[in-house]
């Protein structure tokens, strides 16, 4: 029986990032997620101590959904793929980004944008994951009209 009290996660920092094993919505000492090496986790920063170690949480004040249902806001990300992007664009992506709304017209997908320069994308087709990622990256350089042409061509909707 595994009795891990915490996980060390790589969030792209030079310091440790620690996630308590019961810091998931609805988790207890007896019922908690079992993360494995290589698992992708959507979490948020809870605090940073004086040694610059980052403490993470997968609990959400806004949602009462638990990790065990798979419906919680934060937690283990199943399937999909992680891509990297320039973290300087984090706020642009998170703050009313039109490209993400527009992409919904071309395919169904799930998306998690990290402030650490990581983006997780999950769609039914692997090639759509790549198209979504390319579209998001291209949106930093193109205006709305150029993006519309690009999306139609990329998703063969001309």
Residue ranges and their predicted role:
Residues 2-44, 48-158:
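Single-stranded RNA-binding regions, centering on S1/OB-family and related RNA-binding modules
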């Amino acid at each position: 029986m595994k009795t891990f009290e915490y996980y060390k996660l790589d969030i792209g920092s030079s310091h440790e990032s620690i996630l308590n094993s019961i810091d998931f919505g609805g988790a207890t000492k007896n019922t908690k997620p079992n993360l494995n090496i290589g698992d992708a986790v959507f979490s948020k920063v809870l605090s940073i101590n004086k040694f610059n170690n980052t403490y993470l949480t997968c609990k959400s004040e806004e949602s009462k959904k638990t990790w065990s249902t798979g419906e919680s806001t934060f937690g283990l990300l199943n399937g999909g793929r992680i891509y990297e992007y320039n973290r300087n664009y984090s706020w642009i992506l998170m703050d009313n980004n039109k490209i993400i709304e527009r992409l919904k017209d071309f395919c169904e997908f799930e998306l998690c944008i990290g402030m650490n320069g990581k983006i997780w994308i999950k769609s039914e087709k692997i090639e759509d994951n790549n198209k979504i990622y390319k579209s998001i990256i291209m949106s930093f350089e193109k205006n709305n009209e150029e993006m519309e042409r690009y999306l139609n061509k990329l998703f063969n909707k001309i």
